[in-house]
Amino acid sequence: MKFIIVLILISVLIATIVPVNEAQTQCQSVRDCQQYCLTPDRCSYGTCYCKTTGK
């Protein structure tokens, strides 16, 4: 019984930590996108968009 409780606690802990790490990789401004692409275009709804060449 204790083993099941420990497994539940570990799974809850993992479920709360993983989204926090993902949120840190999302952008708040265009400056945050510079680590993902050389020419950042914009940050929209937490997603980085890079400028593309017309070639």
UniProtKB/Swiss-Prot annotation:
Gene Ontology CC annotations of this record: extracellular region
Disulfide bonds: 27-43, 33-48, 37-50
MF-aspect GO terms: potassium channel regulator activity; toxin activity
Localization, UniProt: Secreted
Keywords noted in UniProt: Amidation, Disulfide bond, Ion channel impairing toxin, Neurotoxin, Potassium channel impairing toxin, Pyrrolidone carboxylic acid, Secreted, Signal, Toxin
Major location category of this protein: secreted
Transmembrane segments: none
Modified residues (Pyrrolidone carboxylic acid): 24
Residues with the Threonine amide modification: 53
Domain of life from the UniProt record: Eukaryota
Signal peptide positions (record): 1-23
Reported tissue expression: Expressed by the venom gland.
Family: Belongs to the short scorpion toxin superfamily. Potassium channel inhibitor family. Alpha-KTx 17 subfamily.
Function description: Blocker of potassium channels, which inhibits both the delayed rectifier and fast transient potassium current. The inhibition is reversible and voltage-independent. It causes a depolarizing shift of the steady-state activation curve of the currents, without changing their steady-state inactivation behavior.
Domain notes: Has the structural arrangement of an alpha-helix connected to a beta-sheet by disulfide bonds (CSalpha/beta).
Protein name per UniProt: Potassium channel toxin alpha-KTx 17.1
Organism: Olivierus martensii
Species lineage: Eukaryota, Metazoa, Ecdysozoa, Arthropoda, Chelicerata
